[in-house]
């Protein structure tokens, strides 16, 4: 138990180093991107990217399932069979990426061009952004098993370094955006897709080099696939609810109020994502130990991790959220050159929601570890 606590502390520190670096650059790049694109184009990118993200209802459940099963197999020790599970997960995610591509290029394309609300002169740019967003999304879907393996093996140093490379490339994007004379919205979407492909290759090469269990033999194992899909069937309910809540609201706001309101909500979520990094990185360090403790039959140790994780997650987020909740207009004006209307109310609402959600993060992981997710997802 003591050794596990030290490992969690070490991994948390590594992830916090990653987070502080990425948060500082992300907040700066958000400011420059908003100023360079303008409120309307920034809102267009957020709503189109969010619309593509709605297809994560298909892949989102598999993400948590992959992380759970790889951690579980490692926790079983010599009895575990990580190699066949990893190969099966890769094949499943490639298949899911294909489904997303078909749906996005048919139903998605129709809905984007006939039901959503964009300025008439920006529909060409909107469609380019849509295509590049699909590429980015599918690449990220295929990357899931590789990311899950790095987290399950608790190689947080690698995870931190790759994230720093990613955010540095995004800083370069901002520079290219400022000096470029082409359509900046299209260029921004293209460069983000290029970064996604680059990071996917880095994760793949790392896993092949350092994890002998992460070499694909391209043989689908029905037993692992059936087990994962059984787990996912109930998780799908939670994914539908989550995606509908987050991205459905974005689409409704666009249809009734236009892209400028999407920009306000997008800024609020930029701040939320930065603050959530404190909680997510802490829970990311704890999650593999929770699953491994359950797999090893150490339930008392697992419960202790769940209780402590829930308490510390809430307190950490509260510590950083409280000043922003109190002084929201002042902080936004200090950060941005031009603050979109309604950003203050959006930011306060998402922070209050995040504080409530932070209590359940490690609890969800314990449910995933046990495999008994039906009742939780129904609630």
Predicted regions and their residues:
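Hydrophobic alpha-helical transmembrane segments
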Residues: 18, 160-210, 230-231
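Signature of the first transmembrane helix
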Residues: 7-72, 101-105, 170-171, 230-260, ...
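Membrane-interface junctions at transmembrane-helix termini in multi-pass inner-membrane proteins
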Residues: 138-163, 175, 186, 207, ...
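Helix-loop junctions and terminal segments of transmembrane helices
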Residues: 60-76, 152, 211-212, 268, ...
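Membrane-interface helix-capping segments at transmembrane helix termini in multi-pass transporters
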Residues: 2, 6, 39-45, 77-87, ...
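Alpha-helical transmembrane segments of polytopic membrane transporters and translocases
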Residues: 43-59, 88-92, 191, 198, ...
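Alpha-helical transmembrane segments of multi-pass membrane transport and lipid-handling proteins
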Residues: 88-115, 176, 201, 306-358
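Interhelical loop/hinge segments that connect adjacent transmembrane helices in multipass membrane
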Residues: 1-8, 185-189, 203-246, 289, ...
């Amino acid at each position: 138990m003591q050794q596990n606590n030290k490992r969690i502390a070490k991994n948390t520190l590594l992830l916090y180093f990653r987070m502080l670096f990425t948060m500082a650059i992300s907040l700066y790049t958000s400011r420059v991107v908003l100023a360079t694109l303008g409120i309307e184009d920034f809102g267009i990118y957020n709503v189109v990217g969010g619309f593509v993200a709605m297809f994560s209802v298909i892949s989102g459940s598999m993400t948590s399932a992959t992380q759970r099963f790889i951690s579980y197999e490692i926790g079983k020790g010599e009895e575990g069979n990580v190699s066949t599970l990893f190969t099966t997960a890769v094949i499943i995610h490639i298949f899911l990426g294909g489904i997303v591509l078909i749906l996005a290029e048919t139903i998605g394309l129709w809905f984007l061009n006939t039901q959503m609300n964009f300025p008439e002169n920006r529909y060409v740019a909107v469609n380019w952004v849509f295509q590049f967003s699909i590429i980015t999304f599918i690449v990220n879907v295929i990357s899931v098993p590789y990311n899950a393996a790095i987290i399950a093996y608790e190689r947080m140093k690698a995870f931190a370094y790759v994230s720093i490379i990613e955010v540095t490339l995004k800083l370069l994007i901002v520079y290219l955006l400022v000096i470029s004379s082409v359509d900046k919205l299209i260029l921004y979407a293209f460069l983000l897709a290029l970064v996604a492909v680059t990071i996917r290759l880095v994760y793949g090469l790392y896993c092949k080099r350092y994890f002998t269990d992460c070499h694909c033999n391209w043989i689908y194992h029905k037993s692992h696939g059936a087990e994962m899909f059984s787990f996912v069937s109930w998780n799908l309910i939670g994914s539908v609810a989550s995606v509908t809540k987050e991205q459905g609201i974005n689409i409704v706001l666009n249809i009734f109020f236009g892209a400028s309101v999407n920009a306000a909500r997008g800024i609020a979520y930029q701040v939320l994502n930065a603050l959530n990094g404190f909680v997510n990185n802490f829970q990311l360090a704890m999650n593999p130990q929770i699953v491994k403790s359950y797999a090893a039959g150490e339930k008392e140790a697992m419960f202790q991790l769940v209780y402590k994780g829930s308490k510390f997650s809430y307190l950490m987020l509260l510590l950083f959220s409280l000043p922003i909740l109190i002084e929201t207009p002042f902080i936004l004006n200090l950060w941005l050159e031009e603050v979109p209307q309604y950003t203050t109310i959006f930011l306060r609402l998402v922070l209050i929601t995040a504080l409530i959600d932070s209590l359940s993060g490690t609890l969800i992981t314990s449910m995933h570890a046990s495999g008994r997710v039906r009742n939780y997802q129904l609630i």
